C-alpha cells in the first residue's frame, strides 16, 4: 500500500505524492523505524519498502492478516498507475486507498474521487472472487449514497481465446463486473457491455477495454470489440468517471448528435397527436 497514518498526528500521507526520493526517505524512513506509521486499514505498524518492480510502498510486519498486506505487486502497480492518471484530471480531489467503514468492503478502495458533487470509486481486481453473494454485497456497499463504482482488472486476469483479440474467457468476477456503458449502446452494435484492464506492455502502462461484449453468465466466452491505448492518452469523463479511449470521445459526440436529431425528428412528426408543435 502507498498510504499511511501518522501515529502521532493523525496525518494521512501517500508516497506517490512525493516526486523527490530524498524527501520521501526523510518523511517516512525514520518514522517507520520508530513505529510511528500505521496502516490506513488495520492500524498496524508499517515501514517503507523500496522495490525495483513497483513504486516505494509500505510493508506490514511479517505474518500480518491485514488484506492490504497480501496484495500482489501487479495490484500495487495498477493502483499506482490509476491514481497518477486520475490526478491529472481531478487533481486534489483524488484519494488513494480510501477506507470505507463497511463489513462488506474487505480492504481500502483503490482510488476514490470526490469532484464537483460527484463521487467515483475505482476498485481493482487481481484475482477471481468465487462467491456470488460476496461479489454482490461488495458492489452494493461500494455504490451506496449515489457513488459511481468502476471495476478495473489487472491485465494478468485477461484471458483471450486463440488469436481472436475480441474474444475473452471471463472469470466469474469478470462476468459479474461487465457493465453496459454509453460506449456500448452508442456503438454501431448498440448492445453488450464493457470490461477494462490496466497493465504494462513494452515498458508502458496501457488501458485495454472490451466494448459491446456479448455473452450471458453461463457463457464460457464473451465476444466484442477490443481497444488499447497508452493510459497516459486515455480520457476521463469528468461527470461519470469513465475511462475512455481518445477515439471514443469524438465517436460518442457524433453519435449523440445523431441520436438527438433522430429524437427531434420523431417528436416533430405532425401526425402524432401527442407531439408538441414547434
Question: Where on the chain are the PLM-derived regions?
Answer:
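Non-catalytic C-terminal interaction segments of nucleic acid-processing enzymes
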Residues: 2, 13, 161-278
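Mg2+/Mn2+-dependent nuclease catalytic core
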Residues: 126-153
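Short beta-alpha junction loops
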Residues: 153-159
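Active-site metal-binding core of divalent-cation-utilizing nuclease and nuclease-like domains
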Residues: 27-31, 85-123, 129-130, 134
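A short acidic, often aromatic-flanked loop/helix-cap motif at beta-alpha or helix-coil junctions
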Residues: 12, 101-104, 158
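N-terminal cysteine/histidine-rich coordination modules
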Residues: 1-81
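Hydrophobic, Leu/Ile/Phe/Ala-enriched alpha-helical segments that form helix-helix packing faces
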Residues: 46, 82-90, 142
Amino acid at each position: 500500500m502507498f498510504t499511511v497514518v501518522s501515529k502521532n498526528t493523525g496525518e494521512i500521507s501517500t508516497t506517490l505524492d512525493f516526486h523527490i526520493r530524498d524527501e520521501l526517505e526523510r518523511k517516512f524512513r525514520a518514522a517507520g523505524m520508530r513505529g510511528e506509521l500505521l496502516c490506513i486499514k488495520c492500524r498496524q505498524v508499517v515501514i517503507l519498502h523500496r522495490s525495483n518492480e513497483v513504486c516505494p510502498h509500505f510493508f506490514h510486519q511479517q505474518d500480518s492478516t491485514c488484506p492490504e498486506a497480501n496484495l500482489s505487486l501487479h495490484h500495487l502497480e495498477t493502483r499506482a498507475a490509476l491514481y497518477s492518471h486520475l490526478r491529472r484530471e481531478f487533481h486534489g480531489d483524488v484519494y488513494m486507498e480510501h477506507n470505507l467503514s463497511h463489513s462488506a468492503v474487505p480492504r481500502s478502495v483503490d482510488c476514490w474521487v470526490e469532484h464537483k458533487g460527484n463521487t467515483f470509486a475505482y476498485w481493482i481486481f487481481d484475482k477471481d472472487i468465487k462467491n456470488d453473494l460476496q461479489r454482490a454485497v461488495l458492489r452494493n456497499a461500494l455504490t451506496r449514497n449515489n457513488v459511481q463504482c468502476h471495476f478495473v482488472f489487472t491485465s494478468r486476469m485477461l484471458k483471450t481465446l486463440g488469436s481472436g483479440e475480441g474474444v475473452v474467457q471471463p472469470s466469474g468476477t469478470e462476468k459479474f463486473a461487465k457493465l453496459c456503458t454509453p460506449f456500448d449502446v452508442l456503438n454501431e452494435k448498440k448492445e453488450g457491455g464493457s470490461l477494462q484492464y490496466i497493465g504494462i506492455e513494452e515498458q508502458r502502462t496501457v488501458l485495454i477495454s472490451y466494448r459491446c461484449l456479448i455473452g450471458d453468465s453461463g457463457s464460457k466466452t464473451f465476444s466484442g470489440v477490443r481497444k488499447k491505448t497508452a493510459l497516459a492518452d486515455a480520457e476521463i469523463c469528468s461527470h461519470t468517471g469513465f475511462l475512455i479511449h481518445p477515439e471514443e470521445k469524438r465517436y460518442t459526440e457524433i453519435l449523440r448528435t445523431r441520436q438527438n436529431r433522430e429524437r427531434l425528428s420523431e417528436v416533430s412528426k405532425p401526425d402524432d397527436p401527442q407531439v408538441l408543435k414547434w
